[in-house]
From Swiss-Prot:
Organism ancestry: Bacteria, Pseudomonadati, Pseudomonadota, Gammaproteobacteria, Enterobacterales
Protein role: Sequence-specific, DNA-binding protein required for Tn7 transposition. Recognizes sequences necessary for recombination at both left and right ends of Tn7 and, together with TnsA, forms the transposase. TnsB executes the 3'-DNA strand breakage and joining reactions. TnsB binding introduces DNA bending. There are 3 DNA-binding sites in the left and 4 in the right end of Tn7; as TnsB levels increase more TnsB is bound, suggesting high protein levels contribute to transposon immunity. Binding of TnsB to the transposon right end represses expression of the downstream transposition genes.
GO cellular component: chromosome
Domain notes: Has 4 domains separated by linkers; DNA-binding domain 1 and 2 (DBD1 and DBD2), a catalytic domain (CD) and the C-terminus (not resolved in structure 7PIK). Binds 21 base pairs (bp) of double-stranded (ds)DNA; binds adjacent sites with a beads-on-a-string architecture making filaments. The CD of 1 subunit interacts with DBD1 of its own, the preceding and the following subunit. Contacts dsDNA via DBD1, DBD2 and the linker between them.
PROSITE patterns, per the entry: INTEGRASE (PS50994)
Stored InterPro entries: Integrase_cat-core, RNaseH-like_sf, RNaseH_sf
Start and end residues of each stretch annotated as Catalytic domain (CD): 268-582
Protein name, as recorded: Transposon Tn7 transposition protein TnsB
Impact reported for S304A: No effect on recombination
Residue span of region Disordered: 137-160, 623-702
Region: DNA-binding domain 1 (DBD1), residue numbers: 1-139
Amino acid sequence: MWQINEVVLFDNDPYRILAIEDGQVVWMQISADKGVPQARAELLLMQYLDEGRLVRTDDPYVHLDLEEPSVDSVSFQKREEDYRKILPIINSKDRFDPKVRSELVEHVVQEHKVTKATVYKLLRRYWQRGQTPNALIPDYKNSGAPGERRSATGTAKIGRAREYGKGEGTKVTPEIERLFRLTIEKHLLNQKGTKTTVAYRRFVDLFAQYFPRIPQEDYPTLRQFRYFYDREYPKAQRLKSRVKAGVYKKDVRPLSSTATSQALGPGSRYEIDATIADIYLVDHHDRQKIIGRPTLYIVIDVFSRMITGFYIGFENPSYVVAMQAFVNACSDKTAICAQHDIEISSSDWPCVGLPDVLLADRGELMSHQVEALVSSFNVRVESAPPRRGDAKGIVESTFRTLQAEFKSFAPGIVEGSRIKSHGETDYRLDASLSVFEFTQIILRTILFRNNHLVMDKYDRDADFPTDLPSIPVQLWQWGMQHRTGSLRAVEQEQLRVALLPRRKVSISSFGVNLWGLYYSGSEILREGWLQRSTDIARPQHLEAAYDPVLVDTIYLFPQVGSRVFWRCNLTERSRQFKGLSFWEVWDIQAQEKHNKANAKQDELTKRRELEAFIQQTIQKANKLTPSTTEPKSTRIKQIKTNKKEAVTSERKKRAEHLKPSSSGDEAKVIPFNAVEADDQEDYSLPTYVPELFQDPPEKDES
């Protein structure tokens, strides 16, 4: 029922149970400055408990169990000395018998040369505070009112007197503290990075306005200013106030968890991010031509740290390129490795399928097409807060480790500032790798990292077997077998088209119009949408997906709200753009519009000249036309005769021009093939080319 050292409240006074002997409970009031242990019948305590006068409570000295003073400290020596004094008493089985205890106390007094009051004080301290050696630890930590402000009385400055310089200084009063606080909160607790010395000078300016009669040598010192700053403003508050909120959250705030703990297994969460690689590349065909720094996209699995997909190219980071890397992450990588002369098996890079969650930057997800991942493929998309690289800390750190593998060897590596010292060469001129070779290096690095890198700082879960090394591919394989394998199969082309950007298109007899380019396909011909008839009802408000990298093919969605698409190819009408990207097409169209606008200005000028000439000619003709009294009907009847005479006159003039200018024998024309006259070709009528009027052959495209 009762336990030794248990603390109870009796009539709201705390008591500690010291011993339980023969139905008697020995206890002692904790808060009393005097007194000795008392015995109470156990049944009486039960009665008090029933009456509600006795209740259990927490031990106010439980913290002493955790105290561990150092061996060379005064507290340790004091505890050991006091414990040795009372040890004969507390070890006696009759220690609670007043008569026996009195004799033992007398013996201690004689042996250690101390007073009875001291011995009883130590015993009382020992019993009240838990009956352990730590109960005798002195409360030095409470000395001096720690944590409490102490204000100096009087007008004299406290502390040692000034040894150097004039003046005696001044005491920091509440008014001076107010000026300290105003200066600190205005100049130090902000993101400007003001130094303490600069802020102190601003305080001096303010102090001089409030106390103009005090000489400068008696102004509060920089040391007093710093002391107040350190005392009143904790370091955590100062740090949080002096950095931007985004920087604090990203680089300073305490971390409460890890990304791995939030991932249930492989495919549970992917992170995607891009960086501009720290290397300059050259053109593959003309190595004298320096192209620039490539864009590197990485998709990584949080649980296993497997790099599941990538993109390397010169496109700027965008939604289109991010989705290209994501499609690569969901697809088999053996083909793309083979394109770069690297042979692998599917087990070397087993990351194929859709994840549960994709975490990316907000800018990379600013497209309505990302909704297709959510609605069509059930991939939850999360966006990281702006300027919060720590939200994608795993993929961010992967960029650093990936590039560290080749930075010490590769030429053209970005090195510090572009400002060159005397005699230093520009690192950009050292570039010699092409994008193909750089991709080979990155692929080899990814394969090494996925299959052989031992991650020393990987935070493992409790159920990981001890013989499982922290290597990404082995963590992936173990997670697929023993954890929730979240990857889901998907058809690569269907995923790629669903994630491409879309735009509304119009349909005419020329084909599907997208940005002035015309497309057609076998399904469109079969539907008869290109027939040149007003009776043809062509659908409106359709959308088409396009890959900005190549204009040759688009994907028309014939039904609103459906993922079914028709592949449409560029028609001959738009053949000038074949093989180009949409960015190149837009540049060409912009240049054509510019040239057209200039040509329109020339056309306007020449048209005005033409119209002026026509008007002048008409005016001249009107002046030359005499007035006549001949009836109108007669003049109209003469039109036929007049036209006949004009034709005759025209023929005579033409005949004059056809007469030979010199006499002589007529030349004989001999054909090269000496064909008969009847076999010669007749050019009196145009040549008929059947291909001009034939329909293009239908292609079975899907």
